[in-house]
């Protein structure tokens, strides 16, 4: 009897996601991950998945930052086939596939999907996006169906199934041995690791000295950095499977 109840619950959860139109992936800060139909990089975006067995018209739906349907952006007149993904650019352009709002990259970002005045899916209480070009989306099940479990993706898949490697854990931040500020003389800036409890081995620091966001290809930190000219040192922790 217990096994039967668990099976029924699993099927009900699957139906709740894959039998409806849902939000499947978002990006709060898009620097250069995806280019829109205007050949520009939208500030943020939301991916919607048609999990029903029939085509839908997006004009029956709205997308917004609160649970107030009257303030939500009406989606354009576009037919979306069953099993198809579509990306809405959130950049305040308010035309075509471009919504009249942008997602907040800080804490407590919300996204609500409406059909008529009813909320049919939503994401609330989001944390600050760990870094630009990081997506937050539903994980895929082994059978190729979307799940109710959300995670971060270092390799976003706008307009496609979320098959990229998930990064469920977020690393801390490196600690400088001096406070931020302007210094007139040369000095060493020593970076030390600040690793969350339970982090795996292999965590390392990469940094830049031109103010840009460190990436996996940035210089690997191994010894104190000497800043000899005006510049901005930025550092970030990296570890496979983490962000």
Specify the residue positions occupied by each region the protein language model found.
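Generic alpha-helical hydrophobic packing signal
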Residues: 4, 47, 61, 185-189, ...
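Residue-level detector of intrinsically disordered/flexible regions characterized by low predicted structural confidence
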Residues: 5-7, 52, 192
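Residues embedded in well-ordered secondary-structure elements
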Residues: 8, 35-37, 100-102, 125, ...
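Activation on beta-sandwich/Ig-like modules and their edge loops
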Residues: 18-147, 217
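Short, compositionally stereotyped local motifs that mark structural "simplifiers"
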Residues: 79, 88, 131, 137-243
